[in-house]
Amino acid sequence: MSPTSAASNGPSSVKPLTGPQKALHKLGLLRDIDLALHLPLRYEDETRLVKLRDVREGDLAQVEGRVTHAEVKLGGQRQLLVTLDDGTGTCLLRFFSFYPSLQTTLALGKQVRVRGEIRGGFAGLTMMHPVVKPAGGELATALTPVYPSVAGLPQTYLRRAVQAGLQRAELSDTVPPQYLQEIGLQPLWDMRKALSFLHNPTPDVSLAALQDHSHPAWQRLKAEELLAQQLSQLQARRARAQLRAPVLATPALSVPQVSVPNVSPKVWGEAAVAQAAVRDGHLTPLQTLAQRLLVALPFQLTAVQMRVVAEITQDIARPVPMHRLLQGDVGAGKTVVAALAAAVCMDAGWQCALMAPTEILATQHFAKLVGWLHPLGITVAWLTGSQKAKERRDMLALISSGQAELVVGTHALIQDKVQFKALALAIIDEQHRFGVAQRLALRSKMMSQAASQSEPASGVEPHLLMMTATPIPRTLAMSYYADLDVSTIDELPPGRTPIITKVVNEARRDEVIARIRGQIAQGRQIYWVCPLIEESEALDLTNATETHTQLSAALPGVMVGLLHSRMPAAEKQAVMRLFTSGQLGVLVSTTVIEVGVDVPNASLMVIEHAERFGLSQLHQLRGRVGRGAAASACVLLYSTGDAPRLGETARERLRAMAETNDGFEIARRDLEIRGPGEFMGARQSGDAMLRFADVNEDARLLDWARRTAPHMLDQSPALAAQHVQRWLGGKTDFLKA
């Protein structure tokens, strides 16, 4: 089958696919529009010939000349060495891999055309493995595109497939011209003209404008892509508004103004005053579960936390499903906000589920929620994959009967045997750690089981609260999360001591261990984190085990624990109990303690090979300390290995950690370093939404797309649907998760 029939808008052929056709599918090039939108990485200029006297080192040059010398050198590595003379100079052509046919093409006296990068050196001008053709052929009339590809997919085949897809694709304009006129893109560059130009640019165009995507043709595509993103998310938001959800109404969590010594409402907020008033006997609490929980808490909520609680409770009091993201820095107090939302749900006679990505984090949530809610008469169930059969049966019975009003667990919550009686609110912590399929499974389970005595299950969708300790920069919230309502806790609870972060060379490891001795002498505890080596679990385990052995020998009399991903769940829990209770002085761990672990007595975090960690991950790990009143520190141990110095990206990450504790600033810098696609992980394990636009560099176009989407959806719904289908196809499942 030819590349011209490798993709189409219709069903796939039943004939077996060839190697290149399989490669096209691997790239996701299934439709003609996919091929048309598969744009070049770069371009090569085959439209002109240059003279060797005019070239400089580093140039990509195309030269014609005569072969004046050719030999196969049989030294240490077999090479074909050819000298080319164009009358103005000579160039050495060097090939380390070649067939006899190439020797024939480059035989002495042959006239040839070669194209490649000019290099310098003791032999003079050199090309390594240039492209070779017979001389005298017609020159290209457009720049030659070089496309993203995979093994088994030659550029020549891919170019033909793309050109065929471009010819067949339906490329009529889907964006009304009046919208494009606002940004000066109509009628100069319609969709077909823009794509045709980018696949076949004329030789007089600025290569810089093509490479940095500032050319008007690129602007047209980026504007359309951003508009498709905004339309798809607005469609998702409006579709949810048509669904029914349980109404979880409760009296507002506000209290009468009272005066309590040493507690200022301006500083702490009304809720904190009420908490103090109840404890001091000044006020009788309201009798809703949420109010009783609020006043029974052993700490005072901030005004920001209360504002976020109000946003959530207003959402779940409506008959449409909430779809809200709660973001806050490490230790900002998101769990208590979730607990108050759960209390409102349970007050209304419904069940709530909280799903966490790891058993350690789920265990911590369970312990905390039991401590807060059990004294108030609430049954909290616990469900994980490692439970023993009897305990699991007991938990499943509590859940299905409705006796368990709150269920905490891992992905075990989405298994088929788990049957809720009346589930109305799902809370997903560290939602980015779950794949889209897992989040969709929980949502599907919620929809099938959202029922109560007073309301049939059919058509009822539960409320969804997602939480993340990885703050999302504003530009990404406006683009990748435009379908969600976002609540932000942008301040830490009072009493937190800022963490001092030091970047230390591995050569000073003994000094770090000496500092650990000092912390132990003061009764403090220490984390020592080893990097998770994805390529080898065995190497990961060896690394952590060796560090554990070394620290145990260097710290006689100190209990040093070991925690890693390959340990059975029961052993992990036992180690964490020892550390939480203070019996372990040092905990050597891989990144299984990255999120959620809360031990206020831990005051020092040492991260080994910090240069291997991402910036967000480093910040999450640092957040395990600084949770008590004691001064806390984070030591970033780095090693350059065999290199003379750290790479620039690693230096930027470590520098950012040393300069700020602010998670929102960390997120901004992380976005700068990695770019939106990698930062988001394609909306956390979903399909990527932006291939061409950059939400930072294209802020003007993003603002236009945000303003245009609602107008287009209202005034031209058919065109809006066609536009989303063209750009995203079926890649919108994650909007439901």
Question: What are these model-predicted stretches?
Answer:
Residues 89-102, 139-156, 180, 207-217, ...:
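Short hinge/gating elements
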Residues 1-30:
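Helix-hairpin-helix
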Residues 304-310, 317-655, 665, 707, ...:
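Inter-lobe coupling/hinge segments of SF2-like helicase ATPases
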Residues 38-68:
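OB-fold nucleic-acid-binding modules
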Residues 18-23, 31, 248-257, 273-326:
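Conserved pre-motif I regulatory segment
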Residues 633, 641-737:
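C-terminal accessory region of SF2 helicases/translocases
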Residues 57, 73-260, 267-268, 273-296, ...:
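Upstream accessory/linker segments immediately N-terminal to the RecA-like ATPase cores of bacterial MutS
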